[in-house]
Amino acid sequence: VEAVEAQRIGTGFAELDRVLGGGFVPGSVVLIGGDPGAGKSTLLLQASTALAQHQGVLYVTGEESLQQLALRAKRLQLPMEHLSVAAETRAEVIAQLVERQRPKVVILDSIQVMQMEALDSTPGSVTQVRETASFFTRLAKQHDIVIVLVGHITKEGGIAGPKVLEHMIDCFMMLDSPAGSRYRTLRGHKNRFGAVNELGIFAMTDLGMKEVANPSAIFLQRGDVDSPGSIATVTWEGTRPLLVELQALVDDVAAGHPKRVAVGLDQQRLAMHLA
């Protein structure tokens, strides 16, 4: 079998392309998960409208009406004239739309509401998620198109549905939203066509997701003046170095056993470092 270099499809977001390994690969299936309100749908709608200026894109929503989608796009000031949209949850009908429109990229929001009409189980069940994911994976390979699946997560932080879902897809990303922060981090956990653990950073604004061009600036709170108990250091995230700030506060203790507490660092890991 001869290996052919695939022409990647840029998303219009350098941070998203970084996590993908340079853009979407034709014939691949991408899964993006995250907490409710993290911005998964917002990010993908922005990327879809940007892609639609040069590529055929089909955005399928199963969780909101077309009117709601249009209102969201209007609020974000996104051009919708070149984007094909559909409100549908039946996998077979979506396949017919793909056959008829021949898009290069298909967004499905979300995999947990998609269903196969031949199955008796309810949408979101283990059987439905497994079979619809398998169906869309075959569809992507058959037509050499990109299919992006939005996935809900459980209370434990994993993707809702069978574990086999993560094995079917080619790329798995998580969009995290730290409590009380407007910043979002997109991290790749699996990528058959690029490096894993790549990190993309965005800021949620009134007009949607904006890329953070200099992530080190948001991790450093120190000024030019030296501050006792504070240092700047470098950490690697994927292929990118980031400057972060470490702060320490020491106080006298009357008890026989001093207590060590860390914010942003696992307590067991802290104990190992201090041992």
Show where each model-derived region lies.
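Conserved P-loop NTPase
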Residues: 1-2, 99-106, 112, 168, ...
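Flexible beta-alpha connector loops of hexameric P-loop NTPases
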Residues: 5-8, 33, 58, 80-88, ...
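The Walker A/P-loop phosphate-binding site
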Residues: 1-78, 95, 99
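Substrate-engagement module of ASCE P-loop NTPases
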Residues: 127-148, 152, 168-179
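Loop/turn-to-beta-strand initiation segments
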Residues: 55-57, 81-82, 102-105, 142-149
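Short regulatory helix/loop adjacent to the ATP-binding pocket of P-loop NTPases
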Residues: 73, 158-168, 198
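Conserved nucleotide-binding/hydrolysis micro-motifs of P-loop NTPases
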Residues: 36-38, 63-67, 75-78, 89-93, ...
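P-loop NTPase nucleotide-binding/switch module
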Residues: 1-23, 114-121, 151, 210, ...
